[in-house]
Amino acid sequence: MKGVVTSMTISEMAKALDLERLSGESDREIESCYISDLLSRVLGGCSPDDVWITVQSSLNMVAVAIMIDVSCVILPEGLTAPDNVIEKANEEGLTIFTSKESAFSLAVKISKIIN
């Protein structure tokens, strides 16, 4: 369909959603988004090139995100990550953002701008 965006870059999404970048410089494409805080569910349900929205801000979150090869991670509700997590994410090339919005609101907006 003409005028329908089927994917967009991380930078385009960040600008559209007014996200604050905590780590990473990647500008990968995003295909969809996935919301979960239970790492075992994320391993089974999140796909490469997804945006992962989670309140998890531990080193385990970074490991799971890298294992799945997500496009980026968004921490909702103004959450941030400890320095050691940001440092590890930068080492691994993982882009992490924070947003003041809820996970639900972010997912709805992402769905609207990529579909």
Where are the model-predicted features located?
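Feature captures the catalytic cores and cofactor-binding loops of soluble hydro-lyases/lyases
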Residues: R28-I30, L39-V51, Q56-N115
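Short, structural beta-strand-to-alpha-helix junction motif
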Residues: S7-S11, S102
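Short, Lys/Arg-enriched N-terminal segments with co-localized hydrophobic residues
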Residues: M1-S7
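An N-cap/entry alpha-helix motif that binds or orients negatively charged groups
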Residues: A14-C33
